[in-house]
Design a protein with these regions (language model features):
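Charged, often glycine-rich, active-site loop that binds/positions anionic groups
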Residues: 92, 96-122
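C-terminal capping/extension of enzyme domains
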Residues: 1-9, 114-126, 153-245
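Proline-aspartate-enriched helix->loop->beta-strand connector
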Residues: 126-148
Length: 245
């Protein structure tokens, strides 16, 4: 999957002209994703006045190693590195959507309310699912924004929302979120990537957290130790299964 090529195709679709002009004018932003054990997901890249527009991308490792404080990225970095444990080289990041806007209500109010907006959402989510499945293939996903939960299929039993359509097994509730495991894909014609017949992520852990920022209490933040323990759990199970005869 060539992420840049696919996004260029999406932004050149005829329906783009029917969406708010800022979608086309600002362009899109994406990470140069690679295979990693941990994947952190956000919602969509923000846009601040004066920032460059167009097709912007780069490796997430640059952000992981940045020392300068950032209201968004600094709390994320603290989940990965504490001086004793360093998960930065094992972690990738993506936003599930690629349009640039600061207002978290923009998608609901301006995109999903537009008949053509649904296709825009589906096309982006289809790309995102392929990146997760085919490129990153993580052992642990941290879904770091409650707004994103629905798009993974988390609320299917409660609301009937399918979108990417993962099936989850609840493992346990923790102060920093709900830990689940991927068990397969929903059998639904509404899945946004019907060409994906089986997931490569069976057994992968998913930690559903709230949106984490500088104001989030320490107890509600995943720590490097917690993430390392979950990874160790996954890897120990792999070792035990390899002994099966």
């Amino acid at each position: 999957m060539d992420t840049g090529k696919r996004l260029a195709e999406i932004w050149n679709e005829s329906y783009i002209s029917s969406l708010p002009s800022l979608v086309k004018d600002r362009g899109y932003m994406y990470a140069d994703n690679v295979q990693r054990d941990v994947l952190i997901t956000g919602f969509n890249p923000s846009f601040r006045d004066g920032e460059a527009v167009g097709a912007l991308h780069g490796p997430i490792q640059t952000i992981w190693e940045e020392k300068k404080h950032d209201n968004y990225w600094s709390p994320v970095r603290k989940m990965l590195y504490d001086g004793n444990i360093d998960l930065r080289s094992r972690t990738d990041y993506l936003d599930i959507f690629y349009f640039r806007e600061q207002d978290q209500h923009f998608l609901k109010d301006k995109i999903l309310s537009n008949p053509n907006g649904i296709r825009f959402v589906v096309d982006q989510l289809n790309l995102t699912m392929h990146i997760i499945e085919d490129i990153v293939s993580p052992k642990l996903i941290i879904i770091k924004n409650k707004e994103s939960w629905a798009y993974f299929g988390k609320f299917f039993d409660e609301k009937g929302w399918v979108w990417m359509g993962y099936k989850f097994e609840h493992i346990q509730n923790m102060e920093c979120g709900e830990l689940c495991r991927i068990t397969g894909l929903l059998e639904s014609k509404e899945r946004i990537a019907p060409e994906i017949k089986q997931t490569n992520l069976i057994g992968a852990f998913v930690l559903f957290t709230k949106h984490i920022n500088q104001y989030t209490s320490l107890s509600e933040r995943p720590t490097p130790q917690i993430l390392k323990d979950i990874l160790n759990w996954y890897e120990t199970e792999e070792i035990v299964r390899s002994l099966s005869i």
